[in-house]
Every structure is written in structure tokens, then in C-alpha cells.
Amino acid sequence: MTNITFHGGVNDIGGNKFLVESKDTKVFMDFGMSFSQEGQFFSQFLGARTSNSLNDMFELGILPKIKGLYRRDYARHMDFDGNEDTEIDAVLLTHAHVDHCAYLPYLREDIPIYCSEESKLILQNFDETSSSQYLTAKQRFQIYENKKGTMSKATGDKVAIPRRVEIFESGKEFSIDSIGVVPLPVDHSIPGVHAFILHTADGSIGNTADLRFHGRRKDDTEKFVERCAESDLDLLLCEGTRVDAVPSLTEYDVESKVVDIVNNTKGLAICGYPVRDLDRLLSFYIAAKNSNRDLVIDMKQAYLLKLFHASDALRGKY
């Protein structure tokens, strides 16, 4: 029998953590942060205690209390076993927005994360421009005797363990033990978003991820809808944050309005948008070109573009 357990993402914005169990296969779809829970207990400069983070997150109901799921250095230090084998076969990541990926650093490094090339590079950008640990797990509680004969805490690359990241190919089915997975691109405000169709022993499950119909890749979303209709789904997990919202401006409308505003502005024009929204970056880039201006971006976004350019699969896409 196939079961789905929702450990977040229901009646909430974000926090998606869907556990699919079929036969002996267990797969999480996303492992993200709930904005409402984080806002209730934490703030920008106040988070879970490093020395007791798992227990804090369990006590507050933010993370599911599942043995074998979390990184062993945390689990052992916080008396949550840490020596058992994991029963989780993989995490399927729809995309690299924090409400879908923020808690990946808590997971065991030997649980494979399946994602798109774009999502992997965005996670790499997080790691290399902040203290995040999406692609590596830096062991926190290792003590050693230093040259002076006193005890020191091991830090840096010498305690970094690479996570197992598997890049899937859009539209190409692959298997995680008994579950077949078809990743299909959809349009959203960050590159590399993929919906999933899972084929289990008991039927097919669709997960829309976050999707929209008004961006530069709306055709991808429409093709996914068609694929769902063809797949005879038994269950559809659908993102519904703005399901009843009135139609909004398209990205091309935004581009046109920005051109008009910038052309009617003297002197410096300053804009704000999410660093990883490269479609919005393109809108402002086109507006800058059409108004004979130079577009200046921040270093994190510049580095993300560099990572994309270094990828054979993504070079020239942005």
C-alpha cells in the first residue's frame, strides 16, 4: 500500500515535507521551511540553538521526529541516537526556494538529493556566499588534541562531508527503488523548478511544485498540465497559495512597464527583486538596454550567473 504523510505544507505557505512510502521505498518530496512557524518562534537574529537545534525543532513541532533522517553529528550530540541506518531512500527537490529546501542541511549527508542542475547551482550559490550547508555537511562537534596539547574544535573543510546530489534530466523518467519518477519543468520565479509524477505499485501521484502561468516559461506549465491529463493520476498534490487570485501581470507586462518607468526617470534608477529570480533580472536587463542604461547587479547574483555560465547544460540560458 502507498502512503503519503504530510509533515508540513498543508494549510500553510511553505514548509513542504511530503513523505511517500510505497512497498519498502520511502521518499521525501521537498524539506522546506514554514514561514508561519519560523515567524512564530524565530527572528532574523534568533534561531534554534546550535548545540541543541534538533531538540528545539522537535519541541516546537517544526521538524518531524524521525530516527535515521537527520545528520549523525547532530543526532549523537543531542541524544537522538545517530547510529542507526536510515530508512529514507531519497529527497526529491522541486526547487531551491527556502520554503521547499531550507531544512535540507539537517538531513543525513548520505541520503541522496535529486534535483535539477539549476537547483544544484543555486544551492551551491547559497553555500559559497553564506554559512549554509546544502551541498556539504560540516561536522560540528568534533574535538581533537592540537599541537599545544590542548583540545580544539575541528572546523572548516577538514570536517566537511559532501552530500550525495543526483541531477535528473527534464522529462526523463528514473527510478528510486520501487518508485518511478518523471520530473517535468514548470514556470516559477526561480530557475529549474520541476513538478513530479510518481508511479508507485498502487497508482500515480502528481506534485505540481510551485507553478504559474504568467512567466516566461508558461508553456512548460501548460505542458505539465497536459501530461497530468494523459497520466491518469490517482492523486494530485497542488500548490494553492494563490489558487483563487485574479490574473496578474505577465513577466512581459512587467518588462514593458519597467521600460516606460525607466525611460521617464532622470538620473539613477534603483530596483529591487529577489536575487535568484533570473527572469526578473532579464526584464530589468532588457529595460536597461532599451533605455541606454547600464544594469548593475549585486555580487551574489553575479556569482550565480557565473555558475550558470560554467555549466555546459545552462551556458547562454541567462
Locate predicted features.
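A generic "binding-loop/recognition-motif" signal
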Residues: 97, 119, 301
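A contiguous, basic/glycine-rich beta-loop/short-helix subdomain that forms a polymer-engagement track
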Residues: 299-318
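His/Asp/Glu-rich metal-coordinating catalytic cores
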Residues: 2-12, 16-90, 105-279, 283
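Metallo-beta-lactamase
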Residues: 88-99
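Loop-centered beta-sheet repeat module
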Residues: 267, 277-295, 300-303
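Short, surface-exposed beta-edge/turn micro-motifs
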Residues: 15-17, 294, 312
